Amino acid sequence: MVRAHQLLAEWLGIKRVKLLIGSSIGGFQCLEWSVMQPDFAERAAFIATTPRTKPWASAFNESQRMAIECDPTYGERSAEAGLQGMATARSIALMSYRGGMAYDKTQEDENPDEASFERRVLSYQRYQGEKLRRRFNAYSYYRLSQAVDSHNLGRGRGKVEDVLQQIKAKSLVVAITSDILFPPSDHTILVENIPNVEYHLIDSDFGHDGFLVEHKQLNEIILNFLKE
């Protein structure tokens, strides 16, 4: 992925940028780019990300791939193949993106004491799966999940800790308190090994998706980082 971006930057004549920024999978690429081309960015921001995908995140991804594989149309040479399986995969992914606090905060029934089998959260899961089904491809989804699992900054380079020390850009690391996909503990290795780094923790009930929801907190952190 980074090599594709590098080719584009080269074609556009971009030799250096003020800020390289990425969150989640974008953070994977930001880290990779910062190592592959240490002088490309003056500053780099790594948000809700990790230098190496851990078993917990890969377990979610494998469950999603299993859901896609259960779709009887998966494997057909058609853009429509595997879409029902992908809708199910999306519902699995959402739980890892949001976490329990976010679900309890946003999907509780109007009258919890009277809640029956037909609960609000059930329609939410199906709606989100169908929404993705209308705009995405199951084969692309499957391959992207494999790309996430393959992420490892140390592969072919040595210990991740040593590789991180090669980053030259002034760096910002941002984690989210309730993120269960890439929890704050996953960011410790970044903070302890990137030479010139500052760390911020966003307080949010929205899990990994907190970087999409907590605009005010994140905006303030990034603006202050750029002013320094």
Task: Describe each region flagged by the PLM.
Residues 40-42, 46-131:
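Alpha/beta-hydrolase-fold enzymes
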Residues 131, 150-152, 177-182:
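Acidic catalytic loop of the alpha/beta-hydrolase fold
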Residues 127-128, 143-163:
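Active-site nucleophile elbow and catalytic-triad environment of alpha/beta-hydrolase enzymes
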Residues 1-19, 28:
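Conserved acidic catalytic loop of the alpha/beta-hydrolase fold
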Residues 167, 173-175:
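Short beta-strand/loop motif that positions the catalytic acidic residue
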Residues 156-161, 169, 180-192:
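Short alpha-helix in the alpha/beta-hydrolase fold that links the catalytic acid
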Residues 188-189, 196-228:
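Catalytic active-site module of serine/aspartate enzymes centered on a nucleophile-bearing elbow/loop
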Residues 16-55:
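Conserved hydrolase catalytic core segment
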